[in-house]
Each structure stands twice: as C-alpha cells, then as structure tokens.
Amino acid sequence: MRTHYCGHLNKSLAGQTVELCGWVNRRRDLGGLIFIDMRDREGIVQVVVDPDMADAYAVASQLRNEFCIKLTGEVRTRPESQVNKEMATGEVEILAKGLEIINRSDVLPLDFNQKNSEEQRLKYRYLDLRRPEMSDRIKLRAKASSFVRRFLDDNGFLDIETPVLTKATPEGARDYLVPSRVHKGSFYALPQSPQLFKQLLMMSGFDRYYQIVKCFRDEDLRADRQPEFTQIDIETSFMTSDQVRAVTEKMVREMWLELLNVDLGEFPVMPFSEAIRRFGSDKPDLRNPLELVDVADLVKDVDFKVFSGPANDEKGRVAVIRVPGGAELTRKQIDEYTGFVNIYGAKGLAWMKVNDRAAGMEGIQSPVAKFLSEDVINGILERTQAESGDIILFGADKANIVAEALGALRLKLGKDLGLTKEGTWAPLWVVDFPMFEEDDEGNLHAMHHPFTSPLGLTAEELKANPAPAVSNAYDMVLNGYEVGGGSVRIHNAEMQAAVFDILGIDADEQKLKFGFLLDALKFGTPPHAGLAFGLDRLVMLLCGTENIRDVIAFPKTTAAACLMTDAPSVANPAALEELAIAVTVAKEKSAE
C-alpha cells in the first residue's frame, strides 16, 4: 500500500512520486491551500493539497485529526525560507495527487497536545502509543532487544527457551499460580526467573545460554517494577565471575555506544561494604558527589546519648553528610528533610551549619553544638573537609537505619540542590555481597537466592560460621539503578544442601522442592555463573525516563491491573468448577 515511511522522506527523493499511509496529525486551511501533517511510526511530513487537485482537495476538506489515510504525491523541496528545522523532514513537503480515507476517527479521549492523566493513557494505551514520544521509546526497546540477540549470538551464546508453567520455588516474592485442570488441586507457578532451568542447561552441557524472557512476581509495585517483566537471562559454564562481568559489561558498553553514541568507559568495581559505608546503598548513584562519613569514634564519649549510644553499640552507626552550600537551607527545609528521613526509621536529623570556618565555634550554628566539645566539632569539620557555607547532617541509630535514611537523603539532596550531574552516566559493579542477611528474630535469609556460591569457603566452614560469609555475587549499577545481577552458582550437592540447612529448609522439604536439582548436582556438574538484566529498566535508562511503564507497550498499574482490558477479572463459574476451585472473598466489616 505504500512505498515509503513519512519520516524517511528527504531532498534526495525530490521529484519522485511516493505513496504513504498513516494518520492525520494536524490539518490546516491556509488561503485556499490545505496543509496536512501526516504521521506514521517513523515521523511526520507536511502534505500540501492544492485546490487544482479537485478530488484530493475534496477528500482533504473532510479530514480530521487521527483519520487513517493513504496519500499519493510528489516530493518537492521547500523554499529556503519555509524549511522547518524542527522536523526531520523539514526540507521537503508532498504535493498531493491522490488522497484516500482508509478509516475515520471519533474524537479522541486523549489530547495529544497536552498532558493526559496516566489513568487515561493506560486505558487508551493503543492511542497513547501513537504519540511520537511513546513510539520512539518502543522502537528503541526493539533496537535494544535486537542488539542483545546479535551480541550474544556473535559471542557463542545459544537462545534456549525454558518452561513458563513450572514449580513454585522460594525466590523472594510471591508466585503467580496457575491451577491444573488435569491434576486437580495442584498448581503450576509462573517463573520469577528461569534460574534453576538455566543452571540445568549448564549441567546439560550447553555452555553459554541466553534468553529474553518474561518473568512474573506477585509483589508490591513501584515505578520501576511490574508484575510481569522482561529479563535478559544469561548463564555460562567454565567462566569465572570476572569473565562473566567482562562479557556482560562489554555488551552494555557497546549497546550504549550503538544506540546513544555514548562511551560509558570501564566500569569501576566496588565491594558491597564500601558502597554501604560511603553511599548508604548497594546501588549508589555516583553522579551525586555527596558521601556518608563515619564519626562514631569522634562522638563515642560525648555527653549526648543520641550520638554516644549508637557510637558504642556494635550494631549502631553515627555518620554525617556534608552538603556544600547547605548553610543556606532554611529551618523549614531542614524540618522537611527531617520528616523525609523519618520515613526510613530515623528518629531525627541533627544538623550543624558552618557559617564561618575561620571563626571557630562562633562560626558554628547547631542545636547540638552545646553537647559537643570544640575538639569534637573540629574533628568532624576536619574529617568532612567542611568549608564556610556548608551544612553537616547527622544520622545516629542502628547501622541499617542510618545507611537507609542517609542514603535516601543523599539522593534527595542531590536532586533538590542540583548536585547530581544530570545527563551523565555513572556505571559500576558492586561485588562481595553478604551471603546471608539476618531478620529481627535472628534467622538467616539468602541475600540474593539460595543457589549463590559463597566466596572461598567449604561446606563445613560455611555451616560452622554462616553469618559473616561473603557470596560470589555481583550487581551492575547504572545511575543508581540495579540493571543486572548475578553470581557464581553452587555446583556441588554438599554445598547446596548446606545452604538449604542454614536457611532452615530441612531434608524433607529439600527433597520435595529441590530434589531434581540436588540429584542433577551429583552427575558431573560444571562450575557455572550467570547474570540477568532487567530489559525494562535498561530501556528506561536509554530513554531518559523514570518509569518503566513508559517503555512497555501494555503495562500494568501499580495495583497490577490492566485498565485497557480490565484484567484481572472474575472467572467464569463453569471454568472454576472444572478446575475444582471454590472462590471465597473475605467480606469487609461494615462500619458501625
């Protein structure tokens, strides 16, 4: 039906007759001539309809926005004075010779010329995707997927599919369950990841595997999460963690170079402990210059329990953030930041303004200065390298609360005060994660997943002292987002059973849930390691947006609902009966 896309037309085609198909982006009547901005997925071109072309003019007079049309016309160069430098096709226009209405359009429930609510955009997603901004994002996603396949194919990886209907395994989130009609009372689980299957593929000898795959997690959502998401899943045999990081870093660097013409440079490597100590996060945004500085040793003897208490607690921490120019913050702003850290469990936010460093104590303004000696204050100023005009913000509590609260505050301050270098890229690898994390009851849980190998320990050594164990795991972080995570896997049945034991999974449960894996580990399993990227998150960063819904064609809301199709919906009673399922919905208590 067409010979060209609208957005591909240029001066080299001048004088040629082209056939275009697309939509009316805008129509204007000017002095007898009708101008149409015609749009398709590749862009917009201006069409001129002259009254001398009577048939085309009659059709053009009927056009309204979003009519679907077909056009036959001649490409001509615009006069220099009429070139539109804002359009990729701005040097040319099409003189209409034939015009056909393929389909008319009702008045749209969306206004493409102003901001629509996200609810409306999701309800009429098929219309929202017509907007050039959205179309460009989906096209960039397609290019990213194509690049990944090409890169991994060229590096000897095999694209192998794994099951979607599988067995529930503990991976940190709730499973989406699918009832079996044949095996009544039994359920499949939709995979949270292909983790075990890709490990089994290594045991099968396939050596290098990848898959761009849908995964499902029934968890509380946020801007960068969806109940169904797409993973670039990778697994290798006979490769070290350094080698896995090298090939996947190369993939991301080449992707950014090809799609954005940006050289990310070599990724620095940072241990987990350093990331938490300096930035309060295991996914630090290195575009932000603010850092956490520990001062517990300076305040452990002060007569101020808010500081000395955590400073003398082995699980406590006292740290500060020096904010350049922060002395200009008003009391109201400081109170707002105090309320912000309260969200993360902090009880307050002590502060110290350095109005004049040269003036000594007289140049210090702080509600806690009276509790601190001049030596302590000078020690804090020296350690933070504070200058006149700065403010120092304190966190004093359990170490995890200080890290989380000040880590979040660091990001907020960076954004609010313009300290974060927008428009730049700051990748890194975070490595050497703790193998386990402890809950409030003292129980250990796998920080990543229970198939991650410990670093430099035998099964006996791990069982003897599991709490301080470090895992052979690694995360790729870009601008404060974890875009990929992986590890060296356990390839020994004894070690895998030891990890299950530590996690409180007894022998019977091990056999029930993971018997197939433990059996497979007995048959010459090769050492293997892998990594999975979140494709949605990678594309979100490529597109410069902050919400993965912007880069998914048909996303769900934060309530895991599809506003367009009204999914999820109530099932047909006959279908439920065939599945031997009875649905009970708890009734809300009526107000008394």
Curated annotation (Swiss-Prot):
Localisation: Cytoplasm
Keywords carried by this UniProt record: Aminoacyl-tRNA synthetase, ATP-binding, Cytoplasm, Ligase, Nucleotide-binding, Protein biosynthesis
Species the sequence originates in: Vibrio vulnificus (strain YJ016)
Reactions mediated catalytically: tRNA(Asp) + L-aspartate + ATP = L-aspartyl-tRNA(Asp) + AMP + diphosphate
Cited SUPFAM superfamilies: Class II aaRS and biotin synthetases, GAD domain-like, Nucleic acid-binding proteins
Annotated spans, Aspartate: 195-198
Function: Catalyzes the attachment of L-aspartate to tRNA(Asp) in a two-step reaction: L-aspartate is first activated by ATP to form Asp-AMP and then transferred to the acceptor end of tRNA(Asp).
Recorded name of the encoding gene: aspS
Catalytic activity, EC: 6.1.1.12
Main location: cytoplasm
Subunit structure and binding partners: Homodimer.
Protein name: Aspartate--tRNA ligase
Matching InterPro entries: Aa-tRNA-synt_II, aa-tRNA-synth_II, aa-tRNA-synth_II/BPL/LPL, Asp-tRNA-ligase_1, Asp-tRNA-ligase_1_N, Asp/Asn-tRNA-synth_IIb, AspRS_core, GAD-like_sf
Binding site for ATP: R217, D218, E219, Q226, E482, G534, L535, D536, R537
MF annotations from Gene Ontology: aspartate-tRNA ligase activity; ATP binding; nucleic acid binding
